[in-house]
Structures are given as C-alpha cells and as structure tokens.
C-alpha cells in the first residue's frame, strides 16, 4: 500500500516550521514562555514550599541513591509529607544511616546497580516488603568515570545509570 502525503497539510506545517526557525531565539523563547503558565516557584523555593499541602499518606515510594544529595532530600521531604519511603543505597549501612536520620516511615535496602544480580535481589525484596509501589525515583548514578570500565560487557556509567535502573523497574 503506497504512503500518501496530503500536500496541503505538508505545506502548512512546513510554513509554520520555517517561520519558527526564522525567529530569533529570544522571540521563540518569549512565545514558549507566554504559552506556559507561570509557576509561583523560583530559585529560592525549597522542597518544603513545593510540596506544601501534598498528602502522601498511604503512598509507597522507592528512591535509589537515598543516602546523599538529591536522593536524601527527596526521601526527607516525601516522608515529611507522609509517604513510606524505601530508601535504597549501595550498602545496607548507608541505607540504614540515611533512613534513621529522617522522620517518618522508611525501609532501608541496599543495591549495587553495577551488579545485576544485586538489582534483581533488591527488586525481589521490594516486592516482598510492600503490596504495591506508587513510585520509583531512579536517582542513583555515577558520573565522569576517569577511564573506560566495563561491567557485564557494557560501559560502567551506562550500566549503572541506565541499565541497572531498567532492570530494577
């Protein structure tokens, strides 16, 4: 079956595309920003500000990399809003330390995203611990590994940041 092109629609779309590409970047940004509603949040907003009024009681959310940085802050604020957080770190000790330092319901688990058997074990533990999972925040990762390292036949950073989380899901 041959593919048919509606020339009139094609010309209309190409005209819009050519006009958009001819606009200066500032004009295009103005059009896009005017189309989107303005948020009341800005660079001074805190996680508490953004989640104010959010009731997460009864929700279970797992977070990888929950022992530091954005993962830890996410766990802290989600538990503050009533969620049960499964805090996942590379070692059980790190997970326990992070989970015990926040107020609210947490469950510490460990997971090494570079070791796929560890990922499967962690996923199995999550399934045994909770009846349902409302969210998974794939926060853990590595960056700027100085030299090429292979894990399971693929580059380490790709294995940890992408494939490990894919297997976990």
Over which residues does each language-model region extend?
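Rossmann-fold NAD(P)H-dependent dehydrogenase/reductase core
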Residues: 3, 39-169
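N-terminal secretory signal peptides and thylakoid transit peptides that target proteins
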Residues: 2-18
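N-terminal membrane-anchoring alpha-helices
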Residues: 22-41
């Amino acid at each position: 079956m041959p593919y048919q092109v509606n020339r009139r629609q094609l010309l209309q779309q190409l005209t819009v595309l050519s006009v958009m590409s001819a606009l200066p970047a500032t004009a295009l940004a103005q059009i896009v920003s005017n189309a989107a509603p303005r948020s009341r949040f800005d660079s001074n907003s805190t996680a508490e500000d953004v989640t104010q009024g959010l009731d997460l009681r009864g929700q279970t959310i797992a977070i990888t990399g929950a022992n530091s940085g954005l993962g830890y802050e996410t766990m802290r604020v989600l538990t503050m809003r009533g969620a049960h957080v499964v805090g996942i770190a590379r070692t059980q000790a790190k997970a326990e330390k992070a989970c015990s330092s926040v107020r609210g319901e947490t469950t510490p688990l460990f997971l090494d995203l570079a070791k796929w058997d560890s990922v499967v074990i962690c996923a199995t533990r999550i399934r045994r611990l909770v009846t349902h999972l409302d969210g998974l925040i794939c926060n853990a990762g590595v960056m700027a590994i100085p030299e090429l390292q292979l894990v399971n036949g693929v580059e380490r950073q790709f294995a940890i940041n992408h494939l490990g989380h894919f297997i976990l899901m």
